[in-house]
């Protein structure tokens, strides 16, 4: 899915997991991302109510979802679940969704939290931050969101 975004567009990113969904927020102008919250993935109703509240609060222009893959790049069971989640986000909230290869994002998140002395229970939100920062870092200077 693609759409041109303004230079100061706000993005929400998600690290989808069976028990928890890490969420991060970022901005195209500053090209920075920060860990936001962790949504407990209790059931579909709870998941989308919580995400809907975040979307209402942050008013993102687009969403980024981490795509879990095996180290060799092959998809696995969680790949399909994350894709379904992203497609549901697009359908429910009518926002463009972009995918980011999230291999090793949790490893990087844990290392970053340890280095800063932050709580390990924030790893899912920090992984979402890593995913979003990877996305932002990969954008060309004259960006058209895609």
From Swiss-Prot:
UniProt source species: Burkholderia pseudomallei (strain 668)
Pfam families reported in the protein's UniProt record: RuvX
Enzyme class at the top of the EC tree: hydrolase
GO CC terms: cytosol
GO molecular function terms noted in the UniProt entry: nuclease activity
Keyword Cytoplasm among record annotations: yes
Listed name of the protein: Putative pre-16S rRNA nuclease
Function: Could be a nuclease involved in processing of the 5'-end of pre-16S rRNA.
Entry similarity comment: Belongs to the YqgF nuclease family.
Coiled-coil positions: none
Record field: transmembrane: none
EC number from the UniProt entry: 3.1.-.-
InterPro entries: RNaseH-like_sf (IPR012337), YqgF (IPR005227), YqgF/RNaseH-like_dom (IPR006641), YqgF/RNaseH-like_dom_sf (IPR037027)
Keywords: Cytoplasm, Hydrolase, Nuclease, Ribosome biogenesis
Biological process, per Gene Ontology: rRNA 5'-end processing
Location of the protein in the cell: Cytoplasm
């Amino acid at each position: 899915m693609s759409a041109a975004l303004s230079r100061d567009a706000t993005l929400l990113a998600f690290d989808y997991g069976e028990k928890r969904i890490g969420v991060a927020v970022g901005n195209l102008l500053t090209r920075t991302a920060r860990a936001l919250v962790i949504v407990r993935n209790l059931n579909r109703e709870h998941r989308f109510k919580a995400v809907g509240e975040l979307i209402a609060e942050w008013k993102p222009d687009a969403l980024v979802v981490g795509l879990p893959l095996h180290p060799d790049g092959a998809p696995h069971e969680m790949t399909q679940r994350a894709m379904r989640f992203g497609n549901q986000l697009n359908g429910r909230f009518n926002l463009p969704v972009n995918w980011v290869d999230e291999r090793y994002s949790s490893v990087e998140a844990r290392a970053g939290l340890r280095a800063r002395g932050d709580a390990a229970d924030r790893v899912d939100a920090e992984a979402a931050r890593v995913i979003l920062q990877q996305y932002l870092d990969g954008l060309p200077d004259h960006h058209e969101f895609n």
